[in-house]
Amino acid sequence: THQGAEWVDGSDAWLGEMWPNNEERKREIIRDFDLVADWSQRHNIRILLGEFGAYSKAPQDSRVRWTAFVREQAEAHGFAWAYWEFGSGFGVYDPNVKVWREDLLKALIP
């Protein structure tokens, strides 16, 4: 999710990598969400997924698929969520041309 991020050393090596959107990778995310949900239930503490997103240098279709799946899992597990962020490198809005990144917006708000 940080492909080509200027503040992450070596992240240019990840440029162009696609999130495979296969069952194995989905199970990894589901497993992590299940662990958090179990902890949440045992301790009676609600969860806010306070930050998730994929940097704009990653392939857009991969960003959209990953974002949609993470959002879907957060909602399926009863977690509130907040996308990182509105209008910069991860943004769902492009302030330079004043347009929504529609595919990413639909991944968040279908």
Per-range role (PLM):
Residues 1-110:
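Substrate-binding clefts and catalytic carboxylate motifs of secreted carbohydrate-active enzymes
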